[in-house]
Amino acid sequence: MTTLPEITVQELQQRLAAGAALVDVREVDEYEQGHVPGARLIPLGELPGRVAEVPAGEQVLMICRSGARSAKAGEFLIGEGRDVVNVAGGTLAWIEAGFEVNTGNQP
């Protein structure tokens, strides 16, 4: 089993500013209630059928509510040949750090 690398929400903010891709694997209702600006929604249960939507050839950042589902998603995607990093603490840590969140269904 591969150890999934992790970054902090502070590192996430820096990487997003540099144009990194972020995938949120929570459910639609969770995403709509509040998500990191720019995060693309691909619910964990849909991920196996939507792997092609995850950018290849670049590192992709994964996020969920607390970091558990995104870690599972990351391990799966590593097996699919993707380069992924998990966001430690997830959206809860992002909000706790005082960063902006978007609501609704648009990234």
Predicted feature locations:
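Rhodanese-like catalytic fold shared by cysteine-dependent sulfurtransferases
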Residues: 1-21, 27-59, 68-107
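Short, surface-exposed ligand- or partner-binding patches at beta-edge/loop junctions that are enriched
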Residues: 63
